Amino acid sequence: MQSRNVLALALLCAGWAWLSVAPLAPARAETSTPSYSPAQLVELLKKVDERQKNQGDWRSESYIEQKEKGKVAVVYEALVYRRSADQRFIILFTKPKASAGQGYLRVDKNLWFYDPSVGKWERRTERERIGGTNSRRSDFDESRLAEEYTPELLGEEKLGAYNALVLNLKGKPGLDLAFPVVKLWLDKDTTNVLKRQEFALSGRLLRTSYYPKWKKIFSESKKTDIWYPQEIRFYDEVEKENSTLILVRSVDLHALEANLFTKAWLESKSR
């Protein structure tokens, strides 16, 4: 029963706390539009992915605050583990007490949810809202835009103080994606994501996300710096007063134990 309540709220965890910073200012269209070939747009997405890819292991603490209309805000804390080599992924909730021990495991493109109160594993889809928030598994995982979407250039816009390239992304056939259509605003100078809007196939806007803070950290496995969003703000476009804030903390890129990404390991941490 508790797992249903948690899943009814929304997405995968990473580390959120609600801040009072306003979202980026509305975009203003620029007169000139840069020219990119289809191949160059794919390379641009690969660059976005590569800047965030560790090529090794990842551990972070996440703070999440979920706000819903007419309800008291709920705060979650979770540990997030990733392994680039085989794209394995774990989210383990540590707070609140009612959700502690619940977790998600991704193995071989299958996403599983575990609830220790019933000792049962259930398979989930990429569209699953994680841990009672408005986030999805992909929000906490490595960026794979070039693998999952076909890009189209819409133009160039001013987004607050940033010059942004605006792309429309359509999901590739045969993939289980949380959102089949995505509109993306990329910082022209860094290629970091500034803003993201996600749509249903019908064209209905479902969610708007802002990425106001990015941080770089040196990766020993990659021998260069990688970037990750320290703060992400999700705004539900269907239930207008619902929002989620995620803060990513204490990132550690050292190697994790070999048997960590298993059901047995997650169950042992849930006892």
Predicted regions and their residues:
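N-terminal secretory signal peptides that target proteins for export/translocation
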Residues: 1-4
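Bacterial N-terminal signal peptides
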Residues: 8-22
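Boundary at the C-terminal end of the N-terminal hydrophobic targeting segment
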Residues: 19, 26-31
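Flexible, processing/modification-adjacent segments and terminal tails
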Residues: 30-57, 63, 72-74, 97-180, ...
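Short, conserved turn/kink motifs that form compact alpha/beta structural patches or helix kinks used as
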Residues: 79-83
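N-terminal post-signal-peptidase region of extra-cytosolic proteins
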Residues: 90-95
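Gly/Pro-enriched, hydrophobic low-complexity segments
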Residues: 120-124, 140, 144, 160-263
